């Protein structure tokens, strides 16, 4: 609400500066006529050809305003209002893919009364159909829809009826009501939402409803076969919904049709009735109710998610209640799901109540999810993880005739009332907790699950939340302590909210004034004399700040240890996993790479740490659960970096909207810690705030991350060695020959370069490029970078993209970089899966090459290495020539691929680091010798 008011205030402040634009109802009518006739509309444009309002528009005398057809330009309301408009359809009939409508306000004096005539019907105040972008618009008017005999679908919303693209930062305060009761065609559906009705069909990947708020009551009375109703969207289809809030009451009432048949099924949710797209960081405060002659799938967030998708980091505070005459599935977050939905990190505070009729079939009431079932065609199971319920659960008998051991009994539980898996699928309810009461008049109950069939259960909910306080302390609104495991205060520990740092005092206490609306975490920069407490491999150095808190406190415990002078860090890049059964990436991560990492870790005598350098998943947010499980196989602290593919690829406007998944599963996107004598800094340098669907992500540090870097380094002596870990290298990338391109155009490059150039040495590690690369700025004649900076890029650990076989596109084996720290010095080498340090190259005999030469692929060769030497009979014959090209072994694998999509993504690279030599005539064997930049000599023999 505050966000919307601020937007409107700013817009109104500068609106008077525009002399041109639409300033009266007559202007609006004239513009619509001219636009629809294909005539010039420049007289209503501002300097950049945007159609704009220049004043509030009084529509009291306007009758039957024509709609704006297929709008392809930009329309800016400048915060002005349409007043006294008695509408029957939206202002825009259709906003085209290139269209943008923004900053338009519909006043409370307006009303939309839309009457369906039986055919397909779309209605919303701003647009009946949206294929473009609608942003920063607000509706205060009431929307009323009715249809006495529906022959086709109806889509009704406060702002948009049928949405196939982007609705961003919009709000609805008007009531949205629909009445489709009566003698109606049974197969017809209706979708009703406070912001939009939605769409069932295909949508572009960028389709999103985000940062939207509904505060109006949304209600529907229907006799149709399917009713989809949500506080924000009825049925958004595959559009993602992120950072949306509902504060309005949502009521679904399915009634018998006039012929007495009971046909309806309601999907009812605080945010959406049904969805096939991800939902992240959404909240519901409104009461959600389903009643009448219907079955209902009803949830505080979504009634029925119906695809492989994620519902993550969502909160429900509203009461969820079902009183229908047929069986219903009722949940604090999700009502019913029969697809491989991943519900993660959600919390329910609202009461969940089933008081309906359920004589012959199962009905449920669950604090997080009501019912989970497995269809026969299922290839994957559902996950419910790291969720907490505080709401009270209540279930009536419902006239149910089954005893508690029957799957068709009424089920009530604190987390999932009825959880069905299958022996051949992975289904789980893990790391969840219930603090609410369970009251049921019959059937089966449980604190976590009422029934869990072929499902993995167990674990404990993570204790990673700070405690909300009623009021700030005298010295700050974010306070806490850091103690050691014996209870002794730990002085001097750096504590951050992701923007600023403070240090703990002699009592181990810290305090700061933080903007809790923008700070999601409070966390530590762990000192070198502390060991990491881990949960499933992830260091527990952070606490999540409760949303809406005015103040919070967080308490941390660390174990003291001697500073480890010698240790090893495994740098792992780009697992890029998709869910099991898609492209083999998850199988490779779980069965090949992670076990090899763990085996290597176990073989080391000194402490070992793991840093995963981003692109942990690959454009598929449901893969996060299984990625994390694979990483947990590494029995030691594992630090993670966010990469571009860790965002959902439809993300726009704000980087935070895409990083929400990483934050939900992993934690902060930038943080630091000390190991031995070195200071490690992990940060996000992928900017995903593109402003148009055709834009793309870019690189650099945003203002918040840059401020954090400054604050962090302000506490670090200049004689320290800094290790940076990011997905894209902040200084150098291997995009051009011979040494790659500099990143001088990255966001805030000069500022962060200036900061890092002041330190003794900086080693900048990254993934992203799917190849090994090294660059040392020392001695280079370039205006970029600094002589204290060295850059190291690591190849994709799971092999070539989409192929995920043992050899990657440049011929390097699946593997990772091993960094060995010995006091103040460090070195590194590439470790292939199943091999050791000694294996740094692969040689090919003349029989395997196209030019009858001996070739060797040295996949980690770089400046500082020696030129490879060719030996015959123990005697050096020649230096080998650098002849980059396609690796023969990888080409052999590639030629066996038949899938066209796979071949498209894993084409052999012509940049394999190959060296060649022509052997002496008659010689049938020899060896290659090469020395790396740390003085280690490697030998590879070859014979033919």
Which residue ranges define each predicted feature?
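Surface-exposed repetitive/solenoidal architectures
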Residues: 20-468
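N-terminal active-site segment of His-dependent metallophosphoesterases
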Residues: 477, 529-624
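Short, acidic Ser/Thr/Gly-rich low-complexity loop/linker segments typical of extracellular
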Residues: 496-515, 887
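Extended active-site neighborhood of metal-dependent phosphoesterases/phosphodiesterases
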Residues: 528-536, 540-548, 621-716, 742-763, ...
């Amino acid at each position: 609400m505050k966000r919307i008011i601020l937007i409107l205030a700013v817009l109104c402040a500068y609106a008077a500066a525009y002399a041109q634009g639409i300033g009266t109802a007559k202007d609006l009518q004239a513009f619509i006529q001219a636009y629809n006739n294909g005539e010039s509309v420049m007289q209503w444009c501002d300097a950049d050809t945007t159609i704009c309002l220049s004043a509030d528009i009084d529509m009291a005398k306007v009758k039957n305003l024509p709609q704006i057809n297929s709008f392809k330009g930009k329309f800016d309301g400048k915060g002005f209002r349409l007043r006294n408009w008695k509408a029957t359809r939206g202002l825009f009939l259709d906003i085209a893919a290139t269209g943008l409508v923004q900053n338009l306000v519909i006043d409370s004096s307006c009303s939309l009364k839309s009457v369906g005539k039986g055919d397909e019907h779309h209605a919303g105040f701003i647009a009946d159909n949206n294929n473009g972008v609608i942003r920063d618009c607000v509706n205060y008017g009431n929307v009323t829809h009715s249809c006495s005999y529906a022959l086709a679908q109806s889509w009704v919303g406060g702002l948009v009826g049928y949405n196939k693209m982007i609705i961003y930062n919009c709000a609805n305060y008007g009531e949205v009501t629909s009445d489709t009761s009566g003698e109606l065609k049974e197969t017809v559906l209706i979708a009703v939402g406070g912001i939009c009705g939605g769409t069932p069909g295909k949508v572009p990947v960028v389709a999103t409803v985000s940062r939207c708020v509904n505060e109006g009551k949304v209600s529907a009375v229907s006799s149709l076969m399917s009713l989809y109703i949500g506080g924000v969207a009825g049925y958004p289809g595959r559009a993602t919904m992120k950072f949306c809030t509902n504060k309005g009451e949502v009521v679904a009432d399915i009634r018998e049709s006039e012929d007495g048949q009971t046909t309806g099924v309601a999907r009812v949710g605080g945010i959406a009735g049904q969805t096939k797209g991800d939902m992240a960081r959404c909240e519901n405060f409104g009461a959600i109710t389903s009643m009448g002659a219907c079955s209902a799938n009803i949830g505080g967030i979504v009634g029925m998610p119906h695809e492989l998708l994620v519902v993550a980091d969502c909160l429900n505070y509203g009461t969820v209640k079902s009183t229908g005459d047929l069986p219903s599935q009722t949940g604090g977050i999700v009502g019913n799901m029969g697809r491989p939905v991943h519900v993660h990190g959600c919390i329910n505070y609202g009461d969940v109540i089933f008081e309906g009729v359920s004589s012959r079939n199962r009905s449920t009431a669950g604090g997080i999810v009501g019912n989970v079932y497995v269809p026969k065609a299922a290839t994957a199971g559902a996950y419910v993880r790291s969720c907490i319920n505080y709401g009270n659960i209540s279930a009536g008998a419902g006239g149910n005739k089954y005893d508690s051991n029957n799957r068709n009994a009424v089920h009530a539980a604190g987390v999932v009332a009825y959880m069905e898996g299958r022996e051949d699928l992975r289904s789980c309810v893990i790391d969840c907790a219930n603090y609410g009461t369970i009251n049921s008049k019959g059937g089966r109950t449980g604190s976590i699950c009422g029934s869990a069939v072929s499902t993995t259960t167990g674990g404990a909910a993570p204790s990673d939340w700070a405690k909300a306080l009623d009021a700030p302390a005298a010295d700050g609104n974010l306070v806490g302590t850091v103690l050691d495991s014996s209870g002794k205060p730990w002085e001097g520990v750096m504590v951050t909210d992701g923007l600023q740092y403070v240090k703990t005092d002699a009592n181990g206490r810290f305090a700061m004034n933080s903007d809790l609306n923008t700070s999601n975490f409070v966390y530590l920069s762990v000192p070198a004399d502390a060991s990491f407490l881990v949960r499933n491999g992830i260091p527990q150095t952070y606490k999540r700040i409760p949303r809406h808190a005015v103040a919070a406190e967080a308490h941390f415990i660390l174990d003291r240890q001697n500073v480890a002078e010698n240790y090893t860090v495994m740098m792992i890049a780009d697992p890029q996993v998709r869910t099991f059964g898609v492209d083999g990436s998850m199988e490779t991560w779980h069965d090949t790479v992670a076990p090899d990492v763990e085996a290597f870790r176990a073989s080391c005598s000194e402490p070992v740490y793991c840093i995963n350098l981003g692109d942990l998943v690959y454009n598929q947010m449901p893969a996060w659960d299984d990625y994390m499980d694979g990483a947990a196989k590494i029995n030691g602290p594992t630090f993670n970096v966010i990469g571009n593919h860790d965002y959902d690829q439809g993300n726009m406007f704000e980087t935070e909207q895409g990083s929400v998944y990483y934050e939900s599963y992993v934690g902060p996107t930038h943080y630091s810690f000390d190991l031995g004598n070195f200071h490690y800094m992990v940060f996000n340098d992928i900017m995903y705030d593109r402003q148009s669907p055709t834009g793309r992500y870019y690189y650099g540090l945003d203002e918040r991350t840059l401020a954090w870097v400054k604050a962090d380094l302000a506490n670090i002596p200049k004689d320290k060695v800094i290790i940076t870990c990011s997905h894209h290298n902040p200084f150098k990338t291997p995009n051009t020959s011979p040494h790659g391109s500099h990143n001088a155009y990255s966001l805030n490059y000069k500022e962060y370069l200036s900061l890092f150039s002041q330190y003794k040495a900086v080693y900048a590690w990254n993934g992203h490029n799917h190849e090994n690369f090294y660059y040392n700025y020392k001695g280079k004649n370039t205006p970029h970078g600094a002589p204290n900076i060295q850059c190291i890029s690591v190849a994709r650990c799971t092999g070539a993209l989409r192929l995920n076989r043992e050899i990657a596109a440049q011929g390097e084996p699946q593997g990772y970089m091993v960094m060995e720290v010995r006091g103040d010095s460090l070195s590194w080498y590439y470790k292939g899966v199943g091999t050791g340090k000694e294996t740094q190259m692969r040689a090919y005999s003349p029989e395997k090459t196209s030019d009858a030469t001996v070739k060797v692929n040295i996949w980690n060769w770089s400046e500082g290495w020696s030129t490879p030497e060719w030996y015959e009979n123990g005697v050096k014959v020649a230096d080998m020539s650098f002849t980059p090209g396609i690796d023969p072994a990888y080409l052999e694998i590639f030629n066996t691929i038949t899938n066209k999509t796979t071949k498209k993504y894993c084409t052999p690279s012509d940049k394999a680091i190959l060296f060649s030599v022509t052997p002496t005539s008659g010689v049938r064997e020899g060896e290659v010798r090469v020395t790396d930049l740390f003085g280690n000599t490697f030998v590879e023999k070859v014979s033919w």
